[in-house]
Amino acid sequence: MESQQLSNYPQISHGSACASVTSKEVHTNQDPLDVSASKTEECEKASTKANSQQTTTPASSAVPENPHHASPQPASVPPPQNGPYPQQCMMTQNQANPSGWSFYGHPSMIPYTPYQMSPMYFPPGPQSQFPQYPSSVGTPLSTPSPESGNTFTDSSSADSDMTSTKKYVRPPPMLTSPNDFPNWVKTYIKFLQNSNLGGIIPTVNGKPVRQITDDELTFLYNTFQIFAPSQFLPTWVKDILSVDYTDIMKILSKSIEKMQSDTQEANDIVTLANLQYNGSTPADAFETKVTNIINRLNNNGIHINNKVACQLIMRGLSGEYKFLRYTRHRHLNMTVAELFLDIHAIYEEQQGSRNSKPNYRRNLSDEKNDSRSYTNTTKPKVIARNPQKTNNSKSKTARAHNVSTSNNSPSTDNDSISKSTTEPIQLNNKHDLHLGQELTESTVNHTNHSDDELPGHLLLDSGASRTLIRSAHHIHSASSNPDINVVDAQKRNIPINAIGDLQFHFQDNTKTSIKVLHTPNIAYDLLSLNELAAVDITACFTKNVLERSDGTVLAPIVKYGDFYWVSKKYLLPSNISVPTINNVHTSESTRKYPYPFIHRMLAHANAQTIRYSLKNNTITYFNESDVDWSSAIDYQCPDCLIGKSTKHRHIKGSRLKYQNSYEPFQYLHTDIFGPVHNLPKSAPSYFISFTDETTKFRWVYPLHDRREDSILDVFTTILAFIKNQFQASVLVIQMDRGSEYTNRTLHKFLEKNGITPCYTTTADSRAHGVAERLNRTLLDDCRTQLQCSGLPNHLWFSAIEFSTIVRNSLASPKSKKSARQHAGLAGLDISTLLPFGQPVIVNDHNPNSKIHPRGIPGYALHPSRNSYGYIIYLPSLKKTVDTTNYVILQGKESRLDQFNYDALTFDEDLNRLTASYQSFIASNEIQQSDDLNIESDHDFQSDIELHPEQPRNVLSKAVSPTDSTPPSTHTEDSKRVSKTNIRAPREVDPNISESNILPSKKRSSTPQISNIESTGSGGMHKLNVPLLAPMSQSNTHESSHASKSKDFRHSDSYSENETNHTNVPISSTGGTNNKTVPQISDQETEKRIIHRSPSIDASPPENNSSHNIVPIKTPTTVSEQNTEESIIADLPLPDLPPESPTEFPDPFKELPPINSHQTNSSLGGIGDSNAYTTINSKKRSLEDNETEIKVSRDTWNTKNMRSLEPPRSKKRIHLIAAVKAVKSIKPIRTTLRYDEAITYNKDIKEKEKYIEAYHKEVNQLLKMKTWDTDEYYDRKEIDPKRVINSMFIFNKKRDGTHKARFVARGDIQHPDTYDSGMQSNTVHHYALMTSLSLALDNNYYITQLDISSAYLYADIKEELYIRPPPHLGMNDKLIRLKKSLYGLKQSGANWYETIKSYLIKQCGMEEVRGWSCVFKNSQVTICLFVDDMILFSKDLNANKKIITTLKKQYDTKIINLGESDNEIQYDILGLEIKYQRGKYMKLGMENSLTEKIPKLNVPLNPKGRKLSAPGQPGLYIDQDELEIDEDEYKEKVHEMQKLIGLASYVGYKFRFDLLYYINTLAQHILFPSRQVLDMTYELIQFMWDTRDKQLIWHKNKPTEPDNKLVAISDASYGNQPYYKSQIGNIYLLNGKVIGGKSTKASLTCTSTTEAEIHAISESVPLLNNLSYLIQELNKKPIIKGLLTDSRSTISIIKSTNEEKFRNRFFGTKAMRLRDEVSGNNLYVYYIETKKNIADVMTKPLPIKTFKLLTNKWIH
């Protein structure tokens, strides 16, 4: 029975009894055991509340039941062993308790565990005497002590006493940690005192007041054992018990001795940290006090070295001694003795000056009394009204400063000044006043509030309407607490304490008075010039005097800094009693923290939660009384109103009522939030949260996706954390029915670990309220933190993590405890916390340069999980760091945008709050700011790619990152950065350098090529054979010299001259010097490879020009060279490094024949246009061939593949059926049917929105008179061919709106019901890109319009019928159409004719010939795409005029007027455009791709290394035949079409760099092998990784007289199946890429020259059409140019020889090019292969080359 009772006795939870007494609560001269009555009373009240919530079972246990342990242990479980105690038992009433007695105050069984085998164990009988409770009810401290009246009664008297008094004694809390033993002992001693055992407690000398009895010793021993388990005892206690396990008295005596010692040490440390000295006391006394403290600490083992001691002393100096703070910059090794010598010297000088001062104003005793009564305090900064310029004044805005704490400032007197004074009195330093040369101040005691204030003077302020003064000594006839409302220049209220008169006695013996207001909350004493003018006194800044209107000089004006001042010596002191003015000053010790500051510090939690937390000590360091709660009720935080805005309050009590009780960490709630869009790839898009049911402890983890393996990793992590940290096992996890939780992988994992998944039931959202409310709370906090700090959105999860840390430490109003307390963890030390987004400076100890700034501006995010550091965001490095080496930036607002956070700043409050933590770190951790050997603990844990939304440059104003000077030199405010805030460093990331901290000019991204490489048409291969062309004699010396270099390079451009192998000097377009490069002809190579005569004569013309430019046409107005420079100047060509000319040996030998098996190609392109591919080494350096394609996907095969050629036969494949299947494959359905959207839609909110959209569409149809509503027709009477099926489709647009559309089934429309000759025209993409480019260059306004229900404006000519909409309920009837319904074959053409006619007739537009849907007049250009219109105009009013005309006929909606001069964002035909007029335009599709790609079900690899190129050279598609069944074949073909369809859409819109890969894979849609699918997945993965890339355009130079249209062409010879060549073209208008094309040549070419001719001929027609369009839209002259890297092609175009064309196909193409060049002013120029950006259109390239050719125009 005893063991069963013992097992049922639960442990007493930590903190359930009275709170522990900390060293903070013990004063210097107070006994450590003498806890104040108020504190004890609060402790008793808290304990009473805690015990009142606990249930007690009288029959089983007197100890309150712990709610954390709801499930009792079975009786069969053996009793737990408690450390060294051999056995446990239960002391019943028959053994040790007198009848009716227990230390809980009512009959019960006491947990009693004596040593039964020890001689000290005496089982007491029923008559044993135990101490009784007092008969009177009162506070525990009022209980009579045992020594004064300790009485013992029998059990009967005890019963009567307990019946009458009902006095309860509360037990001490359970000891849960060795570190908590000192605090626990205090509560245990109070427990003994309340139990009338105070007399047995040892005193300071170690002896009790009276002798302890055996029964008392037994009681003492058993209670100590119960509440102090042995596993939680400190080592020194265990040592005592190991000698004598009953010597509890010795433990108590030693504990009291330690408390005495610790109290003295704590008091010394606090005193040393808060030293203040301003000369008001003798310097000898101050030195003695400090020396004694330091000696005591050193004797007690706390070593305070000179460095730290001097730092602490100087920190407390003020007044005349303040400048000694900066002595350490000159004397780093200053000792305490040397510092006190300086203090003594200043004190003696100060005393001497005081003795010599006249005392006609006030006597010394008055000054002392005033000093004591008006001790100055630190106040929040308040900016006074700005002095404005009057006459010749040069006044500037007064800056805000903290009010310092000096009581005695230097005083000066102004000497007499003659009336003829005209020279200004210019003071360079405030200390000039007390040099005794010109001016001295009056003896009026004045407080120096600001560093840049002139002591003893009033600031002249022309902008202030009232005079304000901080000192009450000059106020006459004062009245307290006036009802006056005063605001500063920023419209912030200034509290006014009193109003009175300010009396002047000027040097001409005249007296004047003005009204003055008293307030201590200003930075300067302000003298209003307006009030002086009211009494006929003006300030003359020419003479620098105050004078009357008659010219009488009254007083001089002193200029100090940027302001003008007048001395206070002219003020008459008052005899006012200082205490009559209320709240003039508040002492430093009683000043409270403002509530807005605490509100912001604690993550914007509400006031009630903060007060509960402070009351229950879940937030340490300060108490509830330290906060000013006066403004908490009415305070409205603007950031909370914005960030936490909700529709309505959450319904309370929405938890499941039937949920069982579990022990801590056995029942978890979890939920996932996300995705968050428009973030960089490195930022998480989701987070998953967990909440413990019992403790309400919360965890959050970031996620980049919601895949099964990602969720499984998080579950594995948190289960291991709970098991290891809390020794608990999770039994149940409650979650919703999302696929991330219901998948098979997670279900098996939970089943394997014995965890029960608890899913929410259908339509039961209340069951998941815990997790959902947590996510809502965290998101509210996140929005508020980002709004408050102004940090970029990609740091959103850091705000979530900061909020989680704080929320776990805040007390719940219901349980009165925090989650950390429930979990048994210590409270949050707020002194280690910084506000989210707090500006800081992080130290860089290892810069590249010694003159480089060592401070990196950053923003504090949250405490680190993995160290004692802080996570800080560094915008300049685009990183977050984990470091303790930072300094809080003072005097700067934390917001990064243009809004001010608040009227208050909290620099002083933050200093006070963190002073203790920052000042008493180990001495080896306190570093000087100018120490050149500081280490750092930078741990750059993550690289953050910044969102285009950059942080605002508030920090750049304080510490410019581009400056080479230290941050402290920029503003005076930065001088006030506390040096003690520098944390101890550990290690620094070696990657921090000047290059990545400071912005610099844009560096070239050109790679340093260290090997001799040939890149014929872009393919880079190392040459291991001699080249063909010998060096000319003119360049032999230069080449020989260059060949001696170890790092030499050569050009990859070779002459196409077959007979003359001389070098051709090349004019570099990249700004490098001319080079001599050998040239090799394509024809010579063809001879050696193919062994037959060339198909085209490539002989050069008669004049072998040494210049590489071969223009065919020379205009009369522009020279060839100028034309070439004009065309190439603005092209986005790569910058190449300068190359040294290289000497080449003998010509090539006979080349081996080409391998016939290599006629096929791949994404790697085996047949580069370089004719030497067959002889080049395939081995490349690791750097060149690096692909960064490291993925975990098993389906991606990286083996060498031999060919892209599709198989000539497929087993078990019906080819004709497959081709038809491909043509009939339907696109991805993104819409819903009527039954899906409305009838069976279980989402009530979404269903309501679709119903609303449905009725809106029906109303629009009726409004437009879409059908004849007068007559309904019977189905049997109408020809079935004229009946068109109809349906409603529903979809959700990207902006979140729900839309319904009534459409006709045009896909099954009979051909007799429409005219097949009619066409539905839309604007061509090249026309749109051309218009956008011209708009940028000409500063056009771009207006985007949308015409609602456009097709319904067009009448229909044919007789067609449709079924009525479902809501009419007439299934057997038909209605006749009158308008062009969406879906009909003829609707698009009807609408085009309708809108075209209206634009021409009513709007005065005309359609550009050859370019459908492009309309123009003299002012406006319109691009039409169905119902979307894009208007371009130089004058916005012209656009508005067109809009007005359109609105007369059509329902026209303005999507974007485009009137702003800032960046404007458009969504035009799928392109996401960012346009700033006159500057730039960026085109991308990031949002669209983020939405569409995940829907393709492609196995994306977000955690793997991101791809740097869409493919890699050297990979070939196998020739193996497909052996799959027909169903699988169709499924894969369908998948290929979806993937390639999306890729083609993106590629032809703006991602022209992907067109080669898209075109090559598109040729294999009918060959969906595993390898082809893998390559397609790789392409989609690259698109996903680079979805944020944009096509970048910059405005053309305004001085350019012409429009320049250029086509850059390239071809890759024979690298496609059946020896076909790949050709590619890129089109540029004024240097901006507007289009591109990559395709397989239709004819088989027999040489590289033929392939290049074919590529150029394909580009000419589009070039001419674009030229016509540009001339129609813009009247500037146009220059057309063609660039190619084939010299032989240029020679053929220029030549007039027609005899050597081998066949007519390419002969006609060449002749056509000659005609174009000669007749259409087309210029043809040569471009180096390394600069030919069209190379990406014809072959796969190494990563470096791919980036080099594309990073100038798409990034």
Swiss-Prot record:
<feature type="binding site">
    <location>
        <position position="1427"/>
    </location>
    <ligand>
        <name>Mg(2+) 2</name>
    </ligand>
</feature>
<feature type="binding site">
    <location>
        <position position="1346"/>
    </location>
    <ligand>
        <name>Mg(2+) 2</name>
    </ligand>
</feature>
<dbReference type="InterPro" id="IPR013103">
    <property type="entry name" value="RVT_2"/>
</dbReference>
<keyword id="KW-0067">ATP-binding</keyword>
<feature type="binding site">
    <location>
        <position position="1652"/>
    </location>
    <ligand>
        <name>Mg(2+) 3</name>
    </ligand>
</feature>
<dbReference type="GO" id="GO:0032196">
    <property type="term" value="P:transposition"/>
</dbReference>
<dbReference type="InterPro" id="IPR001584">
    <property type="entry name" value="Integrase_cat-core"/>
</dbReference>
<feature type="compositionally biased region" description="Polar residues">
    <location>
        <begin position="1054"/>
        <end position="1082"/>
    </location>
</feature>
<dbReference type="GO" id="GO:0005737">
    <property type="term" value="C:cytoplasm"/>
</dbReference>
<keyword id="KW-0548">Nucleotidyltransferase</keyword>
<dbReference type="GO" id="GO:0003887">
    <property type="term" value="F:DNA-directed DNA polymerase activity"/>
</dbReference>
<dbReference type="InterPro" id="IPR039537">
    <property type="entry name" value="Retrotran_Ty1/copia-like"/>
</dbReference>
<feature type="short sequence motif" description="Bipartite nuclear localization signal">
    <location>
        <begin position="1178"/>
        <end position="1212"/>
    </location>
</feature>
<feature type="domain" description="RNase H Ty1/copia-type">
    <location>
        <begin position="1610"/>
        <end position="1752"/>
    </location>
</feature>
<feature type="compositionally biased region" description="Low complexity">
    <location>
        <begin position="402"/>
        <end position="418"/>
    </location>
</feature>
<dbReference type="InterPro" id="IPR043502">
    <property type="entry name" value="DNA/RNA_pol_sf"/>
</dbReference>
<keyword id="KW-0229">DNA integration</keyword>
<feature type="region of interest" description="Disordered">
    <location>
        <begin position="1092"/>
        <end position="1111"/>
    </location>
</feature>
<dbReference type="InterPro" id="IPR001969">
    <property type="entry name" value="Aspartic_peptidase_AS"/>
</dbReference>
<keyword id="KW-0695">RNA-directed DNA polymerase</keyword>
<keyword id="KW-0378">Hydrolase</keyword>
<feature type="region of interest" description="Disordered">
    <location>
        <begin position="126"/>
        <end position="173"/>
    </location>
</feature>
<dbReference type="GO" id="GO:0004190">
    <property type="term" value="F:aspartic-type endopeptidase activity"/>
</dbReference>
<feature type="domain" description="Integrase catalytic">
    <location>
        <begin position="660"/>
        <end position="835"/>
    </location>
</feature>
<keyword id="KW-0815">Transposition</keyword>
<feature type="site" description="Cleavage; by Ty1 protease">
    <location>
        <begin position="401"/>
        <end position="402"/>
    </location>
</feature>
<dbReference type="InterPro" id="IPR012337">
    <property type="entry name" value="RNaseH-like_sf"/>
</dbReference>
<feature type="region of interest" description="RNA-binding">
    <location>
        <begin position="299"/>
        <end position="401"/>
    </location>
</feature>
<keyword id="KW-0814">Transposable element</keyword>
<feature type="site" description="Cleavage; by Ty1 protease">
    <location>
        <begin position="1217"/>
        <end position="1218"/>
    </location>
</feature>
<feature type="region of interest" description="Integrase-type zinc finger-like">
    <location>
        <begin position="583"/>
        <end position="640"/>
    </location>
</feature>
<dbReference type="GO" id="GO:0008270">
    <property type="term" value="F:zinc ion binding"/>
</dbReference>
<feature type="domain" description="Reverse transcriptase Ty1/copia-type">
    <location>
        <begin position="1338"/>
        <end position="1476"/>
    </location>
</feature>
<keyword id="KW-0540">Nuclease</keyword>
<feature type="compositionally biased region" description="Basic and acidic residues">
    <location>
        <begin position="1038"/>
        <end position="1053"/>
    </location>
</feature>
<feature type="compositionally biased region" description="Polar residues">
    <location>
        <begin position="48"/>
        <end position="60"/>
    </location>
</feature>
<keyword id="KW-0255">Endonuclease</keyword>
<dbReference type="GO" id="GO:0005524">
    <property type="term" value="F:ATP binding"/>
</dbReference>
<comment type="function">
    <text>Capsid protein (CA) is the structural component of the virus-like particle (VLP), forming the shell that encapsulates the retrotransposons dimeric RNA genome. The particles are assembled from trimer-clustered units and there are holes in the capsid shells that allow for the diffusion of macromolecules. CA also has nucleocapsid-like chaperone activity, promoting primer tRNA(i)-Met annealing to the multipartite primer-binding site (PBS), dimerization of Ty1 RNA and initiation of reverse transcription.</text>
</comment>
<feature type="compositionally biased region" description="Polar residues">
    <location>
        <begin position="127"/>
        <end position="152"/>
    </location>
</feature>
<dbReference type="GO" id="GO:0075523">
    <property type="term" value="P:viral translational frameshifting"/>
</dbReference>
<feature type="binding site">
    <location>
        <position position="736"/>
    </location>
    <ligand>
        <name>Mg(2+) 1</name>
    </ligand>
</feature>
